[in-house]
């Protein structure tokens, strides 16, 4: 899921994938694996892979999609794994060796919008899982996908839709601004806004400038259409579920995406000691009760490059 050169520190991706996604807790990492594998499997369902094909897994991260593709198709599948993070590519290459599939894999360090080293019309399928969301110029990335695909080739994408999270941060900001000094009667509300605003844009201007928030499933569909793809099918999945985070300590150390600091950093940098106590007194019982809910929004899209 690591892709764009918009942020100067490419290793932010490895820090998130190998640590912040699961709060540095190996048990929690294992607990969320089935959910991650379900995302990958749905991408592969849309990929329609067959024997003797070449798959380009863009922003491969740990190689989850790539390795599950090999498990499905077998030894005739060749996979090109790309990532902007050299750390993640090394990690994925090590996993490929452990799984005995290194000979089926080619590793390419590049961004999703600059697929250097992959020739024109050289792959049958392009997959992404949480990749385009982080690319500033999604049209350029899609044109690269189109370039490397053979005529009749497919894209199968799974992208998080985080625009509603940004809209919620904007709503919190408006509430705090409208209440002004009256917010003193509700000391938690400004802290809630501060937390969310550190992880998602909280003004229309910030949303417009943010790759993760300035697009929706509809604009994603239209971008794919304008890029020349046809037979486009998109499904938006919105799921309200109980939070899987099992403890306050893990809650503090996780973050929702690679560009978001964990709550522990936000509280240390932006809250006073008194505010940290107020926030924990309010939030910790909810987290530890197991009653907290989370909403996930994912767009699954597949499309075909025309033969002519």
Language-model features, listed with the residues they occupy:
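A short glycine-rich, Lys/Arg-flanked "PGG" loop and its adjoining helix->strand segment in the class I
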Residues: 139-154
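Conserved alpha-helix/loop element of class I SAM-dependent methyltransferases that forms part
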Residues: 34-53, 68
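C-terminal helical/coil "lid" or tail adjacent to the Rossmann-like core of SAM-dependent
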Residues: 2-31, 231-289
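A short SAM/SAH-binding and catalytic strip from SAM-dependent methyltransferases
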Residues: 124-139, 161
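Short alpha-helix
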Residues: 212-227
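Class I SAM-dependent methyltransferase SAM/SAH-binding core
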Residues: 54-58, 62-115
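A short acidic, Gly/Pro-enriched loop at the edge of an enzyme's catalytic core
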Residues: 113-125
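Conserved class I S-adenosyl-L-methionine
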Residues: 156-195
């Amino acid at each position: 899921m690591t892709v764009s050169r918009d942020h100067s520190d490419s290793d932010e991706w490895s820090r998130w994938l190998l640590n912040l996604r699961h709060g540095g807790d190996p048990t929690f990492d294992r607990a969320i694996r089935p959910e991650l594998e379900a995302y990958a499997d749905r991408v592969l369902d849309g990929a329609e892979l067959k024997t003797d094909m070449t798959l380009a897994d863009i922003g491969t991260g740990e190689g989850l999609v790539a390795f599950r593709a090999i498990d499905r198709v077998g030894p005739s599948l060749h996979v090109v794994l790309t990532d902007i993070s050299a750390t993640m590519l090394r990690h994925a290459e090590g996993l490929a060796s452990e799984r005995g599939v290194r000979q089926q894999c080619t590793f390419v360090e590049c961004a999703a919008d600059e697929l250097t080293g992959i020739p024109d019309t050289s792959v049958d399928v392009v997959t992404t899982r949480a990749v385009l969301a982080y690319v500033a110029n999604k049209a350029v990335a899609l044109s690269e996908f189109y370039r490397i695909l053979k005529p009749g080739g497919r894209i199968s994408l799974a992208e998080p839709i985080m625009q509603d999270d940004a809209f919620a941060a904007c709503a919190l900001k408006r509430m705090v601004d409208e209440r002004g000094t009256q917010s003193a009667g509700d000391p938690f509300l400004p802290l809630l806004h501060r937390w969310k605003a550190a992880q998602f844009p909280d003004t229309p201007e910030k949303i417009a400038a943010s790759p993760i928030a300035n697009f929706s499933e509809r604009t994603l569909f239209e971008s794919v259409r304008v890029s020349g793809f046809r037979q486009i099918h998109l499904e938006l999945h919105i799921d309200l579920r109980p939070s899987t985070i099992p403890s306050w300590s893990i809650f503090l150390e996780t973050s929702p995406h690679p560009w978001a600091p964990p709550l522990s950093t936000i509280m240390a940098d932006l809250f006073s000691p008194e505010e940290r106590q107020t926030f924990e007194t309010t939030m910790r019982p909810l987290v530890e009760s197991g009653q907290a809910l989370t909403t996930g929004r994912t767009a699954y899209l597949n499309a075909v490059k025309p033969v002519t």
